[in-house]
A protein has these predicted regions:
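Short alpha-helical transmembrane segments in multi-pass integral membrane proteins
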Residues: 1-21, 79-144, 191-245, 302-367, ...
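N-terminal transmembrane alpha-helices
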Residues: 8-45, 59-74, 78, 103-110, ...
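Transmembrane helical elements of multi-pass membrane transporters/channels
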Residues: 19-38, 140, 174, 206-210, ...
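Residue-level hotspots within pore-lining transmembrane alpha-helices
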Residues: 30, 34, 64-68, 108, ...
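Helix-terminus/linker motif at the lipid-water interface of multi-pass membrane proteins
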Residues: 33-51, 121-128, 184-194, 255-286, ...
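Small-residue-rich hydrophobic transmembrane alpha-helices
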Residues: 51-111, 148-167, 276-334, 338-340, ...
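Hydrophobic transmembrane alpha-helices of multi-pass small-molecule transporters
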Residues: 63-66, 178-183, 211-215, 285-289, ...
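Short runs within selected transmembrane alpha-helices of multi-pass transporters and secretion channels
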Residues: 72, 141-159, 167-175, 199-214, ...
Length: 445
């Protein structure tokens, strides 16, 4: 057990929260720069069509995100508990298993993605020049799936080991390289009408570098985990999939959720509602990243102490993270609710749209203050290996309740239902999350 892991069992919960969460939050914010910078540079250097093409491609990049999250979160949860138990056998097997599944699943994503990328883009309405540009961009992204998925999933394993700063530095390296390469390759390749390919290649090259740096660390530097061979470990694999599936579902089901939000907004409110929804979801996504980063800090803290059967510390750590997540959410929620019109105006909305958008945004964003509760409880269940509770929460929120409610209620209540329904659903899920957490900790002995 390394020094970082021992500290998870001895440091005060507040110090653990600061040590693990700050680097994780910064690291997650860095990850958020990839799609953001691609879009900004494409719009400035290649034009509106290129920016739109990258935008419509983004939902399908969640296939890779889902795979990386499935393997990374599942493996990270197992590792954290193994550290608490000092299970050296798991230390030897965890990376071999991760490499096996990254290789197999990335190969599947690459083949299917390249074959069906154009059809997928057509399904969401891309056509003409935008369809052509988006297909050229997305095909390259799918081709680099192996490097993307290894870089991201192995980084989660670093966090599971409690090495948040190291994980952050490696992610920052990848993001920084992407930001540098993006404009350079777009400018260099736009003269041969391949600027959009330059954007995709920049992203993949950055991930390749991050993947090789990560590989080097685990191969030669890590004191806990070593890369020995590519091998499926049946026992570990079952638990990786059981635990990781709920985290993967959050990524993949977001595609379904956002597709319904957009389609219903356009159907009942036209282009104006669609524009408001686009601005609102961008703000929500940006606000969500720090909470997700904090949850990455919670996972090894809970997992390690749970594995060591330090149940009182598990409760104290969760309490500190929960309260901190509410405070973190408030940092975004308060200014967003006070300066809504100024915030929405950054997205170029017209004055008329801003009048309606201000009210709709405040309704939609109203429950964000409680998002930390929802995310921390979900991460808690993942960390202790309770895949059933974690999976049920995700499926209940994003499919079972959300889909029928968003389809049926607007039929009777019109456009207003599209903005009111999601926060009501979130309140319900937050209450259920708290109930399941209390029920679970009562079983700790």
């Amino acid at each position: 057990m390394n020094t970082n892991s021992k500290e998870l069992l001895t440091e005060t919960p507040f110090k653990i929260m600061l040590k693990l969460s700050v680097p994780a939050i910064i690291g997650m914010m860095v990850i958020g720069l990839y799609p953001l910078m691609d879009g900004i540079f494409a719009g400035q250097l290649l034009g509106q069509d290129a920016m739109t093409a990258i935008g419509v491609s983004m939902p399908f990049t969640y296939f890779n995100t889902g795979i990386a999250t499935l393997i990374g979160v599942g493996s990270s949860s197992i590792l954290s508990r193994a550290i608490g138990e000092n299970n050296k056998d798991t230390f030897k097997k965890i990376m071999n298993n991760l490499l096996f599944w990254v290789l197999i699943l990335s190969l599947i994503i690459t083949i299917l993605g390249v074959i069906f990328s154009k059809k997928l883009l057509s399904l969401i309405g891309a056509e003409g020049t935008i369809l052509d540009l988006a297909n050229r961009y997305l095909t390259i992204i799918f081709t680099g799936s192996l490097f993307v998925n290894f870089a991201q999933s192995a980084n989660m394993l670093l966090r599971g080991e409690g090495l948040m700063k190291k994980a952050m530095v490696i992610m920052t390296l990848g993001a920084g390289l992407n930001i540098i390469l993006d404009p350079l390759l777009m400018i260099a390749m736009r003269n041969i009408d391949r600027g959009i390919e330059g954007a995709a290649i920049a992203t993949i090259l950055a991930q390749i570098v991050q993947a090789f740096v990560t590989y080097y660390y685990f191969k030669y530097k890590s004191n806990t985990i070593k890369i020995e061979k590519i091998k499926k470990e049946i026992t570990i694999s079952k638990e990786v999939f059981a635990v990781g599936v709920s985290a993967m579902l959050m990524q993949v089901l977001t595609i379904i959720q956002q597709s319904i939000l957009y389609s219903q907004a356009f159907r009942y409110g036209g282009d104006e509602a669609g524009s408001i929804m686009a601005a609102t979801l961008r703000i929500m996504a940006f606000s969500f990243i720090p909470l997700w980063g904090m949850s990455q800090g919670l996972q090894p803290a809970i997992g390690t102490n749970f594995g060591a059967k330090e149940y009182i510390r598990v409760k104290h750590i969760f309490k500190i993270f929960l309260l901190s997540s509410i405070l973190l959410a408030a940092i975004f929620w308060i200014p967003a609710m006070l300066f809504t019109e100024n915030l929405l105006s950054l997205f170029g909305l017209s004055n008329t749209t801003l009048i309606n958008g201000t009210l709709y945004f405040r309704i939609f964003y109203s429950v964000f203050l409680g998002y930390g509760i929802m995310i921390m409880t979900l991460t808690f269940f993942q960390a202790i290996g309770d895949a059933k509770s974690a999976g049920n929460l995700v499926i209940m929120r994003q499919i079972v309740i959300f889909v029928p409610a968003m389809i049926i209620l607007p039929m009777f209540l019109g456009l207003n239902a599209i903005w009111v329904t999601p926060p009501i659903i979130d309140i319900f899920i937050i209450v259920i999350s708290i109930f399941l957490y209390i029920k679970t900790i009562k079983k700790f002995k």
